[in-house]
Amino acid sequence: MTNMAEDKTSISKVHSEFSNSSNTTGSEEESRSHQESFDGESSSGESKSKSKLNLEYSADIEPLKFRMTKTNNTNDKLKYSNNGNATDSFMRLKEHLQRGNTLNSNLRVNEFYPFNSIDTEQFENYLREPKYIKMLKRRKNLKQFRRLFLAQELMAYEGETVTSTSKSSEPTSKAIWSTKFSRDGKFMATGSKDGKIRIWKVIGSPVERAELDSSAESNKEARAKSMRIKQQVSSLNNPKEKQFLDSATEKYEEKEKLLNLYAPVFHPTPLRLYKEHVQDVLDINWSKNNFILSASMDKTVKLWHPDRKNSLKTFIHPDFVTCVEFHPTDDRFFISGCLDHKCRLWSILDDEVSFEYDCQDLITSVTLSPEEGKYTIIGTFNGYVHILMTRGLTPVSSFHVADRQTQEQNAHVMVTETDSKIRHGPRVTGLQAFRSQLDNSFRLVVTSNDSRIRIFDLEQRKLLEVLKGFHSGSSQHKAQLSIWHGQPIVVNSSDDHWVYGWRLKSSDRENDQDEPKRKPKGLARSGSLRSIFSKSMSRSSSQNNEEKPHHHLKLTNLLPLPHHSNDHYIKNTDYISFHAHNAPVTCVSIAPPETSKTLSLSNDVICELSLEFFQTSDSFDVLSRSNDDGIMSDVESSLGYNSKPGSISNASATSAIPDVVDAIGTILISTDNVGTIRVFRADMPSVIRKRVLLKLEEYNREVRRRFNSSDSLHSLSRSFNSRAKSNLAGQPAAAYTNTGKGYATGRGYSNICPKSSTSLKTLGSNAQPRTPRESMSSIFSNAHGPTTPTSAMNLPIRCNVCNGSRFEAFSGANDQQDRNYYCVDCGTVVNNFR
């Protein structure tokens, strides 16, 4: 085979070889996708054109933000930030980090810092009519794609306006080619066409979230101040321009006035920015110890670590390095794939190649078998898949993704050595190996540039399923498989600006039950295949059954020839998709469970509300319902319960405790070829949202009742002019209890009816209302406690934290004037200065 890499004279020439090489194996869909524009008809044969779909399912969306009420606490934060006093900083963090204290054995108070100043009217309107991403569904719905909204948009190129047009799909220098999460879920790395690598950090603590909000607020203040300075300078020269700038400044300040993201995932600026690569970064991989490998078109692989500002090592290759992957159990070794046809096993400590294998084709993708990394799988430019033993890189088997005859040859035959016919395309652009949860078989996800995703059983050398719907175009799309409550979900990017998702039918138990009806066709082929299939055919059959030559004689007379025995694969077009970008989407990733666990430690709004308003009866109700479109199906999707027989869920039928991963919900990351990174999240289930809304409505009625009552004016005015500085007074914090299956809150909202005396239970402890238009903090900090004779609304002194009215003096205080009191319900100290 001629080495195509030797003929290239420039980077653009090789890029054109990758993007313009056609598939000659008879794939009509690929040629259509290359010829038609994004404004033409979609390959799925829908009646609407893609341009009409793009208008109906618009990608012109903004991250969900809420208007922030600038309270005294906000002013104090800015004052503390300006003073820089250590005591003030301590007090500021203390206010943010007081997670709660115990009221009694059944009640708990929590402070949610993101709620401290969210405008209740805007939040209430959102809860009534949330605006989610509009989905295009084909027959079935994926639970992981329900209630998606744009949570965050990361600007990799700060200070530059990202523009895109649907008429041109040419990638810019800002195009992002690779996106990978670290194994601990705390970081995400992106590699760009301009050779830059960015490390993004997941918000992992309340301190980080508090600093994030303060930083965003300071930046908005700085931008507004800059505009005012420009306005003053220009007014000296041109009075008319001053009037125009005054109007522009007012509009800007009104638009940008303290808007905070509803549920961010990452810090807005990269933790690290590496610029050592001089050409495109094509692939990125993380090790178990958070080391990073990057493969580039500058013919190098570089080793990084987020704790270091520069690369640790550089590994030189003779040609473009298209793919790289760490050994899953020993990160002293890694595999690289190069355009010189060679796959190399490198020793990082020795800084040398330990083994190499020449596959006689351009290597475009590589992966290792899960868990132990025993096998190395290579994908090539012309559509071949090579399976090697990782130790020594010795060949085991190979086949062509589009040629079933090569797939059914002897398992130990390398088709490139025995085939006189050289097949061209489709190009393999992505590989991912996984273990089936049905039979623990070794399976492979193959993405190719003929707009197909193929699922292979490598042990049986059998094509199981083909996923259709996305448009490959010229990008190196890599489908990602994620196991979500026992169900394999595949997501992929597309050149038509959309994101696609499928549920694997080949992994369904109902489809697996039909397999024995199709497997006799393979049994009639030969004794060797009979032994391969015997385990999945019948566990009770003995070895003597293999020697019966006429066992399936009648069936084989009705079947096609042996080389067509692989015809019965599943054609899966039941995808769900949404218009994610205004430019070709290059990467799509679902955040791993470790990311959700990290995010749950930062007082995430969705997680906190889902756990707080989750009721014990939810789990049993959900498990007893069928998978319909009712209210409980939303809880089913968010909290991980599945009513189908044989389904696997993180929450057992006897457990009433949701897992934090289920409470966080789906986190989906997508990138495009103009440098935009969008973070989509699943909102809280509808039943949780309705309970929160009921809580807000109940609170508003209570506020109106208070303002109409003259007896409570003194207590209201006192709460408006005071600021809570809670002292837990030795009371233990009511954090989540780790039960092994999830995190349980100290109580559930079983009584949310307004008639209940304990229905207004507080969720916050640290903010006070300042106007009749309340902030979110006042909802969860000024709710009343149990209605007893000593807690009537007409008492002049009430606790700023729990709104209780029972106080006792500290023992040992003799002076009546200097005596300090504390709230019996929550332990908050009340002294003369308050």
UniProtKB/Swiss-Prot annotation:
Residues 1-51, 213-233, 761-789 are annotated as: Disordered. The modification Phosphothreonine is found at T771. The keyword Repeat applies. The modification Phosphoserine is found at S528. Keywords: Phosphoprotein, Repeat, WD repeat. InterPro entries: G-protein_beta_WD-40_rep (IPR020472), WD40/YVTN_repeat-like_dom_sf (IPR015943), WD40_repeat_dom_sf (IPR036322), WD40_rpt (IPR001680), WDR44/Dgr2 (IPR040324). One of its GO terms (biological process) is sterol transport. WD repeats lie at residues 171-210, 276-314, 316-356, 358-398, 423-468. Residues 1-16, 213-224 have a biased composition (Basic and acidic residues). Pfam families: WD40 (PF00400). Residues 17-26 have a biased composition (Low complexity). The keyword Repeat applies. It comes from the Eukaryota. Belongs to the WD repeat DGR2 family. Present with 538 molecules/cell in log phase SD medium. This is WD repeat-containing protein YMR102C. It comes from Saccharomyces cerevisiae (strain ATCC 204508 / S288c) (Baker's yeast).
